[in-house]
Amino acid sequence: MSIGILGKKLGMSQLFDDKGNAVPVTLIEAGPCRVTQLKTTTLDGYSAVQIGYGLSKDKHINKPEKGHLLKSGEELLKHLKEYRVEETTSYEIGNQITVKNFEVGQKVDISGKSMGRGFAGYQKRHGFSRGPMSHGSKNHRAPGSTGAGTTPGRIYPGKRMAGRYGGKQITTKGLLVLKIDDQKNLLVIKGSVPGKPGSIVNIKPNNVVGKKGGQKS
């Protein structure tokens, strides 16, 4: 499994294809990231590469973290991410990870924290249908029945109800890389990605999950 890269979502825009159709895209400032640690099967029980992204002030880093980061470079980094790999021989501590690791036309999986929408009702949070708006109805956006009475006499866990909407770590898979600007460390991704502008996202090569029986999809 190859490693990914950390970046910052800048916002959305649009590009035009050969036929003149507008294609919505997301701009991501990806990297440069620094390799901060290499984990091996002998010492750690598994092989992994840890990278860091984003500068941090000295007052926000404690002494153990500072000692760990200074082993790979002079700059203190704010965000760390670890990627499992088969072997770490092709990486060295202090190496730079940039957008050059990706290619135009490649599919990627992007993880981030979705935009929080606060306390939301049934219609907005789950897409439930509303009740009649006229003819004397008093059930416009109410939930309706949430379960039986005597049996089971309670609401089962996991029942879809009103509550906090968004603000969770999610992954959007199979997004297409349309353009790469290695001078500005930019990735242009087709479609939307999790998070609001300015949020940190994790971009990694698309992980193809096999179907039942081990067949590739």
UniProtKB/Swiss-Prot annotation:
Domain of life: Bacteria
Region (Disordered): 127-162
Keyword Iron among record annotations: no
GO-annotated molecular function: rRNA binding; structural constituent of ribosome
Record GO cellular component, one term: cytosolic large ribosomal subunit
GO biological process: translation
One Pfam family it belongs to: Ribosomal_L3
Family: Belongs to the universal ribosomal protein uL3 family.
PANTHER family referenced in this protein's UniProt entry, alphabetically: 50S RIBOSOMAL PROTEIN L3, LARGE RIBOSOMAL SUBUNIT PROTEIN UL3C
Subunit structure: Part of the 50S ribosomal subunit. Forms a cluster with proteins L14 and L19.
Role description: One of the primary rRNA binding proteins, it binds directly near the 3'-end of the 23S rRNA, where it nucleates assembly of the 50S subunit.
Protein name per Swiss-Prot or TrEMBL: Large ribosomal subunit protein uL3
Source organism of this protein record: Prochlorococcus marinus (strain MIT 9312)
